[in-house]
Swiss-Prot record:
Family to which this protein belongs: Belongs to the G-alpha family. G(q) subfamily.
Subunit relationships: G proteins are composed of 3 units; alpha, beta and gamma. The alpha chain contains the guanine nucleotide binding site.
Protein name, as recorded: Guanine nucleotide-binding protein alpha-3 subunit
G3 motif as annotated region, ranges: 197-206
UniProt domain G-alpha: residue ranges: 32-354
GO cellular component annotations of the record: cytoplasm; heterotrimeric G-protein complex
Region annotated G2 motif, chain positions: 174-182
Residues carrying lipid (S-palmitoyl cysteine): C4
Region (G4 motif): 266-273
Disulfide pattern: none
Region of interest called G1 motif, as start-end residue ranges on this chain: 35-48
InterPro entries registered for this protein in UniProt: Gprotein_alpha_I (IPR001408), Gprotein_alpha_su (IPR001019), GproteinA_insert (IPR011025), P-loop_NTPase (IPR027417)
Amino acid sequence: MGLCQSAEDKELTLKSKAIDKEMMANHMSQAKVVKLLLLGAGECGKSTVLKQMRILHDHGFTAEESEQQKSVVFNNTLQAMISILKGMESLRMTFDKPIRENDAKFVMEAHKMLQEAKVFPEELANALQALYSDKGIQTVMAKGNEFQMPESAPHFLGSLDRIKLPDYTPTEQDILLSRIKTTGIVEVKFQMKSVDFRVFDVGGQRSERKKWIHCFEDVNAIIFIAAISEYDQVLFEDETTNRMIESMRLFESICNSRWFINTSMILFLNKKDLFAEKIKRTSIKSAFPDYKGAQTYDESCRYIEEKFDGLNANPEKTIYMHQTCATDTDQVQMILDSVIDMIIQANLQGCGLY
């Protein structure tokens, strides 16, 4: 009788196998959904990285979305010149041609012209182009780190011949460089290598940060983006605080947060193209007075990497670092592919499936 399995035992065995099967199915399901959180201080390039993910993995932007971006490009173009004119005033600099004062006054009062505009107003475009060609304005733009000049200013102001055309449609590069403040949470979904990705971008300004941690403790990885080029710039919302130092403080708080102890941490040192140009003129000593190295890209970048790495209080946690240019689609694709492979592998290992 002891050799015979009772009906009750058989039923328990079948139930156990069913539970095991269900648990494995749940593991497989979890392994096939990866949540990524993009974090970083304001204007570091998070939204640009998210747009690149859409271009590379989510069929880009529809014709309707591109059309909607026109108003953003129009406003960014106008705001670029307004910020330069304000910078000119704060730096107490002047136009090369005094007649440009009339154009400046017109531009400063032109907001209403762009409301509901389907085509960039010709009169406004002419005024902006006249100002942009003025040597005084070009001199002010060369000092853009001393005031809040948008990094996209040269692109949009230099593209007015194209932007003012009646049939203008924003290019992918226009959309990548366009900026609107992120408030709340923006999500992009895509599939890669049979894995579903959900990527979240949240507001980077200080006022938005309280929304971060409690919502995202279950993410698989954090991509933290720091603008490496902003070592000599101050915050938009606090002009006494260095942007690089603020970014490092934020990175330290996220990296060592109890909510993210087991979360993979990936650091994008972004805007490396701007950093490469700026380092020729200005040393990183403006942010790091103790820096003793040469004023070169490689040494300066290595020092900043070491600074960020030193903020990690967990010796068992690896920070995966990449130098990036978020507006370069080819480079972003190569880095994202590498990052995503690493995340998929780590996720499968975490579920016991690798």
